[in-house]
């Protein structure tokens, strides 16, 4: 049965029905989230509204089959004039391309050229590092907001791994139950993106935070289990740590930029500020390319001036 959205969009009956079928397939076959489905419905509706004005009449499957890349560029330019940013434009184009590919697979149109158009580049937004003092306050066990002592210790241990070892949150939450069980270990092997392994040094503060958590955790932390657990013993999810970080921001008066990932960024930035070289930091972060590390660390002006004063022949 057709939904109301079919009658609200400016399109001929054949295109409206095909679009409705596409939306249903996204929900049943691809199992996209409700938010993504809502965004795709809205973005394609805006696209069809644009085409109605662009062509002078509501489009049908025939007009969709005659689309050119220039038409999509005009749509993006129109959205940009309305104030849409690069991220919104990219998402909107993704929805339109998904619809076009669906119509092609169904043999309804041939829009290979238009569906191959690339999304506009999105500017990279980097997390802002915390100051060293703020980072220490965030990872302090005494400063955690959780009422349960073992959960407070758990949160402190996770955050300490992000700041003290530069781990991604997924890497910290994926540690096995026997990780860091040897207090004399000076390093551990981490498997990161692309199944690449790297060696990460272990500071005494990291050992201490994990040991305090182990002593209080009521669940089995043997080798076959995960190290970090949720309140009922299941896997600890990143959203929980992000929520705890939100509480810490409010309690400590930190800006919204103080996120779990910002702790990893702070790890790199503070190492660089104390004289660490980019190649070593690249290895510690697990970046495949040095250029990623150069962008990620965001060398501050003071550090650049110090290097300039020490190394430039005319300084």
Swiss-Prot record:
Domain Core-binding (CB): 13-104
GO cellular component, one term: cytoplasm
GO MF, one example: DNA binding
GO BP annotations listed: cell division; chromosome segregation; DNA transposition
Entry's localization field: Cytoplasm
Active site positions, chain numbering: 168, 193, 261, 264, 287, 296 (o-(3'-phospho-dna)-tyrosine intermediate)
PROSITE patterns given in the database record: CB, TYR_RECOMBINASE
Keywords annotated in UniProt: Cell cycle, Cell division, Chromosome partition, Cytoplasm, DNA integration, DNA recombination, DNA-binding
Positions of the Tyr recombinase domain: 125-309
Keyword Cell division: yes
Subunit structure and binding partners: Forms a cyclic heterotetrameric complex composed of two molecules of XerC and two molecules of XerD.
The protein's role, per its UniProt record: Site-specific tyrosine recombinase, which acts by catalyzing the cutting and rejoining of the recombining DNA molecules. The XerC-XerD complex is essential to convert dimers of the bacterial chromosome into monomers to permit their segregation at cell division. It also contributes to the segregational stability of plasmids.
Family, per entry: Belongs to the 'phage' integrase family. XerC subfamily.
Protein name: Tyrosine recombinase XerC
Organism field: Brucella melitensis biotype 1 (strain ATCC 23456 / CCUG 17765 / NCTC 10094 / 16M)
């Amino acid at each position: 049965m057709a939904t109301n959205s079919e009658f609200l969009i400016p399109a001929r009956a054949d295109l409206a029905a095909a679009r409705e079928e596409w939306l249903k397939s996204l929900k049943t076959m691809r199992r996209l989230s409700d938010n993504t489905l809502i965004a795709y419905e809205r973005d394609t509706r805006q696209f069809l509204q644009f085409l109605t004005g662009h062509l002078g009449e509501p489009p049908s499957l025939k007009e969709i089959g005659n689309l050119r890349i220039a038409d999509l560029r005009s749509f993006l330019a129109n959205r940009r004039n309305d104030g849409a940013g690069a991220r919104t434009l990219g998402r909107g184009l993704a929805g339109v391309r998904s619809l076009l590919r669906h119509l092609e697979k169904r043999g309804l149109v041939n829009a290979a050229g238009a569906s191959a158009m690339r999304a506009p580049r999105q500017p990279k937004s980097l997390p802002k590092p915390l100051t060293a003092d703020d980072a220490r306050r965030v990872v302090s066990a005494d400063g955690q907001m959780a009422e349960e002592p073992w959960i407070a210790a758990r949160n402190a241990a996770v955050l300490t791994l992000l700041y003290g070892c530069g781990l991604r949150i997924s890497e910290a939450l994926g540690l096995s139950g026997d990780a860091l069980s040897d207090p004399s270990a000076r390093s551990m092997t981490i498997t990161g993106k692309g199944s690449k392994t790297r060696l990460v040094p272990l500071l005494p503060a990291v050992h201490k935070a994990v040991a305090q958590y182990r002593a209080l955790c009521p669940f089995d932390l043997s080798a076959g289990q995960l190290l970090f657990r949720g309140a009922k013993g299941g896997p600890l999810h990143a959203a929980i740590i992000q929520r705890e970080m939100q509480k810490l921001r409010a309690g400590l008066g930190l800006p919204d930029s103080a996120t779990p990932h910002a702790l990893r960024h702070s790890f790199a930035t503070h190492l660089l500020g104390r004289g660490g070289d980019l190649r070593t930091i690249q290895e510690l972060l697990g970046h495949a390319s040095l250029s990623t590390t150069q962008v990620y660390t965001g060398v501050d002006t003071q550090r650049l001036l110090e290097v300039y004063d020490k190394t430039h022949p005319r300084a």
